[in-house]
Amino acid sequence: MRNLWLTGIIFLFGSALPARPGFEAVPQQSEVADQALLAATPLMGFNTWNKFGCDINEQLIREVADAMVSNGMREAGYKYLVIDDCWQVARAEDGRIVADPERFPSGMKALADYVHGKGLAFGLYTDVGPKTCAGRPGSFGFEGLDMVTYAEWGVDYIKVDWCHADDLDPRVQYTKFREAIRKTGRPIVLSICEWGRNDPWEWAPGIGQLWRVTADIQDTWESIVWIVNANSHHFEAAGPGHWNDPDMLEVGNGGMTFDEYKAHFSLWAMMAAPLMAGNDVRQMTAETREVLLNREVIAIDQDPLGVQGRIVIDRGYGGQVWMKPLADGSVAVAFLNLSSKELELYIRWSQIGLPPGPAKVRDLWAHRDLGVHSDWGRHFDERFKTMVPSHGVVMVRIRTDQ
């Protein structure tokens, strides 16, 4: 019965919105298999940019790698350690990219070896254009050579930005990177970062494993709400091997409240988004650890069914209810309060595709079972309702035995 129900809810979920005119995100079977091997679930890891910007060096990267092991991040699933912009300074006479010798005196191969020795994967940044966003050498005209170089260094993940590329065709340019990566023979994740300017959800599946859907995130509640709203329209493009990327996490960077960070993390999990920490993981408060290391919320993000959650209730006064079907037949539900006051929100089983009758509800932030609830569709008490703090979230997993 559960398998039949799950098949039905996936069908309803996928057909909830009409196909976009011109949607061409249908990669070949071999491409689907290749991508699924690299990114069967959303990527997890750490990226230097949000916290450190250009203030990076090899000692920092070694300390971050050490911290990701000692603080439990690696065990929780955070695998990739990605160095963003500002690591490169020039090209050698043979055209090869050169890492900053002052900041990275041991070279990238040695640093990759260190990261790999910690049981982590190593990532680097480049740009489609001739220069990166910070004015360092980009990969335009050197795509093949750069991918060979990165493969020789042991790179596992490449983020490719879109600065100085206004006159270029994104599909053509990012395909160059895909083909160059394939020729190296090394499995390397391709992270497409053109900020959603050219509707990547329509063409990026089959080229990269993830693609940005908006401009850069900021450490503010307003930025989170804007990105969540933008990404909510593209859930049909996501799935195993190809993910919408609402950008790196800001959890722990100090610009939001604890409730706002929990909502931020919860919505990223509901949207099956890559979870790339962007804070200083070497020194985290107890609250930051509680958010980033919440195994129950991470499990929603990493669910193998690979469905991006969507909004099923959107109330005009600032409340939303999100749902995400899961591989075991249960449903994750996030009650989000966008308003400035505490709010009561509720859900009926029929609104999230569950059959009527008793269901077990578990709070994923309180880490406790809330008992058995029922919805026979007639009485006020026969639905799950909860109070949600301002700019906060209540996230539950609902499971029926039918």
Language-model segments: residues:
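Positively charged n-region of N-terminal signal peptides that target proteins for export
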Residues: 1-4
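Glycan-recognition surfaces
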Residues: 142-145, 182, 186-280
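Aromatic-lined carbohydrate-binding/catalytic grooves of carbohydrate-active enzymes
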Residues: 64-167
